[in-house]
Structure formats: C-alpha cells, structure tokens
Amino acid sequence: MKNKIVALLALLLSSVGVDAQTHIPTSKIVCRDPFITVDREHGLYYLIKSKYGPDGARLFAYKSSDLEFWDEAGYVYHMPEGYKCPDDWWAPDTYFYNGKYYCFVTVSNQAKGIMRGTTVLRSDNGPLGPYRNIIPDDRIFITPPGMQCLDGSLYVDDQGTPWMFFSVEWNGPNVVDSVGEVWCQQLNAELDGTVGDPVKLFRTSDAPWAKEPSGKSIVTDAPFVWRDEKSGNLIMLWSSFTNVYSMGQAISQTGKPTGPWVHEKDVLFSDNGGHQMVFRDLKGNLKISFHSPNENPSILTICDLKIKNGKFLPIKIK
C-alpha cells in the first residue's frame, strides 16, 4: 500500500509540477493551434496545448481568470502504454458537451506508417482531466480511415446533433494536385462514432483569397464553425496561405453543416497568423484566438472580433 501511495504522489507531482509557473502574460504563452475553453460555472478559461512530457504525457494545460495572465495547471493526458499513435498531438480542441469535457486532437505514428487523423479524448472530472481515449484501438481515429486528416473540430447544430469539421491534408494520398480539402461528418451522441458518410465541402482552390505567391492553393487548416446569433448565418473560419499564413471565412448557403459553402473573396487576417477559434468571454464579448507568427516561437494571440451583416469583420492586432 505504501508503494502505491508513493507512486500516486509521484504521478501527481509530475502532472502538476512542483515549479509550476504562475501569472504568465498571454504574450509569453508559446503555443500553436490555441483553443480557449470557457468554464462559466467557475469563472475560468483553460488552454490545453501539445507538450511532450514524462510517462507518455502529451497535453499540458493553463488556466486564467482574465485572459491576460495564466497559471500552469500541469499535464492533463498521458498515453496508455502501447498506444499506437505517439506522434504529433496537434490542435487539441477542448469542448464541454453533454456534461463532460472532450478533446479532439490530431495524432499519427510516423515509424509505423499510420497517417494523421483526429482522435477523441474525454474527461469525466472537469476541464483539467485526466483525459482518456474513447476511440477503440482498432479504429484509433474519428476521421475517415485511409485518409490523411487533421484539425477535427466539433460543432453542435440547432437540433443538438454533433458534427465534426476536419481538413484532408494536401500531402496525403486522397487529394488531387496537392490541394487540401475541408470535409464534415455527423457524429453519434457519444462522440466515439460516426453517422452516415463524410461530406467533402470544398478545396483550397475554391477560395479566391487562398493563393500563395506561386499562384498555388494548397493548405486547408483549422476549419472552425460559428453560428451568428443575430443573422443566423453559419460561418466557417479556416486558415491557409497568401504570401503568409492567413485566415478566411465562408458562409453556408443553407445554414447547415453540409453547405454549400460560399467563400468571401477578401481575407479576414493576413498578418502571418492563423489556426483560429471563436468564443464569448465571461462578459459575453466575442473573441478570437489564434497563433502568431506562424514560425516558431508561435504565441497565443487573443483579440476582439466583430460581426456585421452575418460576416466577421477583418481582424487587426493592436
């Protein structure tokens, strides 16, 4: 019994950290693909990022009461022994859904040739976990098998039906001419399985703004969907490249996840930042978070966001 207690204490210390940093300014949080989870019950914000640690640790959390300063909250996920996908752990998006917290995250196994895909974790004990895998080992991913996918995000429609939006990567085996794609997939209520077939929504080249200096349209990153309460518009933000990493938006013409989606011709943000998400803060203000610059070290960026006539207005960093 004594050995078990010692082992448990060691695990807790490795997760929280005896030297946890506190009062870290947002401008000092190094993080790609930042996703802010709002805990309205306790008046807190959480950020979970990819960070490799001891004993299979892969995801690390911060918490804040004001979006200006953050405290380290420790590791919130450790891979089970023998887990098939130890690589990447990109874009951990964390949602409160049906009374529990779920994390959609992109993983792979490069050595064994397992292509990237999105898997789903769940915490039964609040936003700081511990998170556990809920997709069985024989499937690993919630994204389609045999496709190189990433950046799965959750959207729950007006009927309470969960959907996942995700990217099919430009360098995978399922795309044409190295042009990335965005798809959607209806999920079951438990978020551990799918309903029906996935639907391809668009290719990078369908968006007039997503043109690199060479003229090519390649990358589709981070599709994130937001319903505008006033207009009813279903708006998708996603990231690609102009001359630098940028963000654009598209509107569903039916108000449904399956679209069709029409792209705004003007870029939303073109100052070398992206992989965005939208949230309302504890006061109800509309905010956007993303990483900027796109090169290391990428920094957590949070700023105000405005909507006019059912579309997001261009973003400017102060």
Regions found by a protein language model. Give the residues of each.
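Carbohydrate-active catalytic/glycan-binding domains of CAZyme proteins
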Residues: A20-K318
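Bacterial Sec-dependent N-terminal signal peptides
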Residues: M1-T22
